[in-house]
Amino acid sequence: MFTNIFNKAIIKTIFFLIITYIALLSKIDKVFSQVIDSKYYDWTVYEFQESEFDYKKCYIVSHPQKIDSDDNSRKKPYLMITRYQKNRSEEVSVFGGYEFKTSGEIFLVIDAFQFHLKAKGDMAWAQSRYDDISLIETLLNSAVVRIRSDSAHGKYAIDEYSLKGITLAYLRMKEICR
C-alpha cells in the first residue's frame, strides 16, 4: 500500500514537472529572442526583451540596395535605429560588415547633408543624442542615404540605402516601445 501511494506521488510530481516545463517553454519563445513585428518596404521592425521583467528594446533595420566595395570578405552591412523603452530614447547605428579603420569616422550623406558617426570595432554611432535626433529627422524626410566607410585593412565601401518605408517603420517602433 505504501508503494502504491509512493508511485502515485511520483506520477503526480512528474506530471507537474512536465506541465511546468511546457509552460516555461511557451514563455521562452517571447523572452530572450528578437521578434519581427512588421516590415515596411525596405525596413523591418524588431522587438526584443530579455525577460518579462525587463524593458523592451525595439529597432528598425535596413540593408543596402547598392554596394560599392573592394572587400569581398565583408559581412552584410545594415543601418539601424534603436529605441529604448526605459528612457524613450533613440540611437542610430551602422554595422559595416568589417572592422572599421581605427579612430575612423563613417560618413552618411543624405541629400545636401553630411553626418559623421564615430566608429568602434565593426559598429558606428552618432556622437551625441542631439546628433541622433538630427540624423533621424533627416532620414525620415529623405529618400536615400549613402554611407562611406573604410576598413581597418585599407578597404572601402559605399553603401546606398533606400529610405522607402522608414517613416512607417519608425512610427511602428515608437508605438510598440512606448
Could you tell me what each predicted segment is?
Residues I10, I14-I19:
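Sec-dependent signal peptide hydrophobic core
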Residues V31-R178:
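A generic "folded-domain core" signal
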Residues T20-K30:
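C-terminal segment of classical bacterial N-terminal signal peptides
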